[in-house]
A protein has these predicted regions:
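Conserved aromatic-histidine-acidic binding/catalytic patches
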Residues: 18, 114, 133, 160, ...
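Charge-enriched, short contiguous segments at helix-coil
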Residues: 146-159
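Coiled-coil-like amphipathic alpha-helices with heptad-repeat character
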Residues: 42, 153, 161-163
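Generic non-transmembrane alpha-helical segments
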Residues: 125-133, 175, 179
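DNA-recognition helix of helix-turn-helix
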Residues: 157-181
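N-terminal interaction/assembly modules
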Residues: 1-126
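Short amphipathic alpha helix immediately N-terminal
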Residues: 132-149
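Hydrophobic positions on the alpha-helical face of helix-turn-helix-like DNA-binding modules
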Residues: 140-141, 153-156, 165
C-alpha cells in the first residue's frame, strides 16, 4: 500500500495498517519516512501547545489581548516544562506528567503520540536491518530503496542480469519482512 504524504494523514493511515502493510509503507517511502515522522511530530506538538495555550488563556478569561495581572506566573517555565514533557512523550510514546490535562480530545493526542513513537521504532528497526546486511548488499539496497538507482542500473554496475538482481532484491525484502514481522 503506497500512500503519498499529500494524499492522506500518515497517522490515521499507519494506525489502521497491519504489520505487513506498515512494512510496505516504510519500504515504499524509505527515503522520506524520517521526514514524514518528523512532520507528524511537529504537527502534533504544535496542536498540543496551541490547545494548552488556548486553555490557559480561556481559564484566565483573556479575550486575546494579554494584560498584566497580579497573579504570579512563569510562562517561560511553563513553555520549557511543556517542551520537556513533549520530548519525553514523543520518545516513549506515553503522555505523562499532566501533559494533556484539560485538553479537548486528549485521547486523540495520546494515540497520535503513541503512533509517532511506534513509527519511529519501526523505521529504526528497518534501517538497522538494512545496515546489517553485508556491505555490498546494504549499499545497493539503500540505493534501490531511496530510489537513487533502478534495479537495472544496479544490475548493470555489478555485471548481473536484471532478473538476477530482481530475484535478489525480492529475497532481501523477504528476509527483512521475516525479521520485522
Amino acid at each position: 500500500m503506497d500512500i503519498k504524504a499529500k494524499e492522506k494523514d500518515y497517522l490515521t493511515a499507519y494506525r489502521s495498517l497491519n504489520a505487513e502493510e506498515r512494512l510496505n509503507l516504510m519500504i515504499n517511502n524509505y527515503s522520506t519516512f524520517p521526514k514524514i515522522i518528523r512532520k507528524m511530530e511537529v504537527k502534533t506538538r504544535y496542536r498540543i501547545k496551541s490547545e494548552k495555550e488556548y486553555m490557559r488563556s480561556h481559564l484566565r478569561g483573556e479575550l486575546g489581548v494579554r494584560v498584566q495581572s497580579s497573579k504570579l506566573s512563569d510562562p517561560t517555565f511553563e513553555e520549557a516544562s511543556t517542551n520537556i514533557m513533549l520530548d519525553k512523550a514523543m520518545e516513549t510514546g506515553e503522555a505523562e506528567g499532566g501533559l494533556l490535562n484539560g485538553i479537548e480530545n486528549a485521547e486523540r493526542y495520546e494515540a497520535d503520540i503513541r503512533i509517532i513513537s511506534i513509527m519511529r521504532m519501526d523505521y529504526e528497526l528497518l534501517s538497522e536491518i538494512v545496515e546489517d546486511l553485508d556491505e555490498d548488499e546494504s549499499c545497493w539496497m539503500k540505493d534501490f530503496l531511496t530510489k537513487r538507482k533502478l534495479l537495472k542500473e544496479i544490475a548493470s554496475e555489478r555485471g548481473l542480469s536484471y532478473e538476477t538482481m530482481k530475484r535478489r532484491a525480492y529475497e532481501l525484502r523477504n528476509d527483512i519482512r521475516e525479521e520485522i514481522i
